[in-house]
Amino acid sequence: MSIISRKGLIMANETTTKNDSTNVSFGKFKVGGYAYAAPVGTALPTDSESALDPAFQLIGYLSEDGITNTTDTDTAEVKDANGTTVMKVVSSYSESYQFVLIEFLRKAAAQMRYGNDAVTGKDKSMVIKHQMPDDTPVSLVFEIVATGNVKDRTVIGSATRSEFGDRQMHSSDVLGYDLTVNANDMGDGVTSIEYIGIPKGQSL
């Protein structure tokens, strides 16, 4: 398990021969909005800066722990007659993202947790049906601004709700929706794409 790290972009035709402190960065989220959800099939961004499709809804603030990106791999070993491992290959791979939505009164945040059909109403005035979790996949985008104003955008084309944290309701803790989503295959085994410092219209 690892908290999402932010690295400077090295272009394919560049050669670096020295350590560079400007490539070290904190992962600060974009001011004004940084977590968005849309139905699968919505046009996905392919760079760090272009405007998102209008179908993407802001799902609000995340807790101070931000996002935890976890990868899980299994390996298979091949051994010879002496029990010596002669080959080890990765046999499976999966990726997930965990975060806590703390805009408890935002309709889009509640829908992200419970599913669109389980939530009716509007911000600050909702009815939420607590029921079997909705496994309808959604597309997610998270936006970070790295040191030096380098834009870092993570795109999950198909995310399925997979785990839900406990919800405590008392006066000393903020209300929120703690959930983990599984990043499904977007094609060719890719589960999510991160665009770091890629201007609008540029591709690598």
Kindly give the residue locations of the regions a language model identified:
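Short helix-loop boundary/capping segments
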Residues: R106-G157
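Beta-strand elements of well-folded, non-transmembrane domains
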Residues: L101-L105, I144-G148, A183-G187
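Mixed-charge, glycine-accented linear interaction segment located at domain edges/termini
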Residues: V150-L204
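Gram-positive cell-envelope targeting signals
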Residues: M1-S5
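Hydrophobic beta-strand residues in large extracellular and virion-surface proteins
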Residues: A35, L140-F142, Y195
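Solvent-exposed edge beta-strands and adjacent loop segments
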Residues: R6-A109, S158-G176
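Beta-strand secondary-structure signal
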Residues: S96-V100, S139-E143, D178-N182
